[in-house]
C-alpha cells in the first residue's frame, strides 16, 4: 500500500487549527491504518519528524431526510504531534506569496 493512500485528507476545524500552533496536525486516515503506518506516511509525505500519534474512531451520525433514515460514514481520525525541531506542515497556501510572483 502506498503511503499516500493512508492519509485521506486534513481535518480543518476551529479546534484543529488551534492545535496547529502546538505542532499538532489532524488528518482523516484509512479505517485500517495503524499508528506506525500513519507515522511513516506523515514523515515521508511532509518530510517532518513525528513525536506522537493519537488515533480515534469517529462513528457515523444518524441523519434523516423526511421519513428516510440513514447514517453518515464512520471515519478514523489521527492527531499527529511533531517534534520541536521539526518543520511545520504547510496545509494552507499563502496567497500573498503567490500574488508577488
Swiss-Prot record:
MF terms (GO), sorted A to Z: rRNA binding; structural constituent of ribosome
A biological process from GO: translation
Record key words, sorted: Ribonucleoprotein, Ribosomal protein, RNA-binding, rRNA-binding
Highest taxon listed in the record's lineage: Bacteria
GO cellular component: ribonucleoprotein complex; ribosome
InterPro entries given in the database record: Nucleotide-bd_a/b_plait_sf, Ribosomal_uL23-like, Ribosomal_uL23/eL15/eS24_sf, Ribosomal_uL23_CS
Similarity comment: Belongs to the universal ribosomal protein uL23 family.
Function per UniProt: One of the early assembly proteins it binds 23S rRNA. One of the proteins that surrounds the polypeptide exit tunnel on the outside of the ribosome. Forms the main docking site for trigger factor binding to the ribosome.
Assembly and interaction partners: Part of the 50S ribosomal subunit. Contacts protein L29, and trigger factor when it is bound to the ribosome.
HAMAP family xref list: Ribosomal_uL23_B (MF_01369_B)
Protein name in UniProt: Large ribosomal subunit protein uL23
Origin species: Lactobacillus helveticus (strain DPC 4571)
Amino acid at each position: 500500500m502506498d503511503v499516500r493512500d493512508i492519509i485521506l485528507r486534513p481535518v480543518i476545524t476551529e479546534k484543529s487549527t488551534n492545535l496547529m500552533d502546538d505542532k499538532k496536525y489532524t488528518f482523516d486516515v484509512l479505517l485500517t491504518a495503524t499508528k506506525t503506518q500513519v507515522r511513516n506516511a506523515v514523515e515521508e509525505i511532509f518530510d517532518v519528524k513525528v513525536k506522537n500519534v493519537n488515533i480515534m474512531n469517529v462513528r457515523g451520525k444518524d441523519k434523516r431526510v423526511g421519513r428516510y433514515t440513514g447514517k453518515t460514514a464512520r471515519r478514523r481520525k489521527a492527531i499527529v504531534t511533531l517534534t520541536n525541531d521539526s518543520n511545520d506542515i504547510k496545509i494552507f497556501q499563502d496567497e500573498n506569496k503567490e500574488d508577488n510572483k
